[in-house]
Amino acid sequence: MKRLDKHGISKFATRYGTVVFFALICAAFAILRPHSFFKISNVVTVLRQISILAILGAGLTVVMITGRIDLTIGNTTSAISVLIGALMVDFGMNVWLACIIGVAAGALLGALNGATVAYIGIPDFIATLSMGFLISGFNQAYTKGHPISNLPKVFSIFGKGSLLGIPVSIYMMFICLVVVYIVLNKTRFGRHVYAIGGNQEAAMMSGINVKKNLLMSYVVSGMGCALGAIILSSRLQTCHPSAGDAYMMDALATVYVGATAFKNGEPNIMGTFIGALIIGVLNNGLTLCNVSYYSQDIAKGAVILLAVTITSIQRSRKK
């Protein structure tokens, strides 16, 4: 009986440890800052702050389910930001058309990543790392390192606008999360993505077009970067050639931390959202406690290390 109890506790800890950890850090900050942490305005602030991260993480989740990685997340976000800014400011294009072209460009960059990985056969780490340098180089060459400003006022709706008192970026985040969740769990593409990540050889033997689905997973990631770029540029009201670069590590952390939730070490959308919340709550709570920005990275690093450790345990038990 004791063995069963210990086994049950251990299984629960590895399966739902991320959710429990999220609840614990919320409780800790609620105790440390009882008059500010759980205020509605602060909750909205956290959701607003993680909106870009969650959207980038959603796209990256699809790629990582296949067992691959996309290291161009930050570079692509920066590049699409500059593209949209250039279309609106340098070419006088309509805001909505510029955003649509930006999303299409994000999909194209994702397709290029997918093609190099799936069809040319370059390892995903090397392929996306190299592509990231290329994207960043072209981005810096076009802007010469200078941001694009004087954006149309209407463009601010994505990053600063609100509907019924809730920021538009939060609506965009939840719509993206729901759409990707449905795609992964209710469509043939989603089933194929999970099959490829589970056992690529078996997926290929069962008739799944592995190369096509890999390419499409990177397309989804690229589109997520484009949507994140729209919110980021709108919020800053400027398009900086390196504005999205800082999101690379946080996006990876979000997916890795989320992989320990709900699906035994596999990346999943619900987990990614929890991962984004953990990163957001840590940043917000530590800021409320007057912890320096640099020290916050120590906390994030510890959380990522813990998450990867739990994920490794989960995967070894599955084997």
Predicted regions, residues:
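Short loop segments and helix-boundary regions at transmembrane helix junctions
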Residues: 4-12, 69, 90, 107-148, ...
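Hydrophobic core segments of alpha-helical transmembrane domains in multi-pass membrane transport
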Residues: 18-30, 59-61, 132-137, 172-183, ...
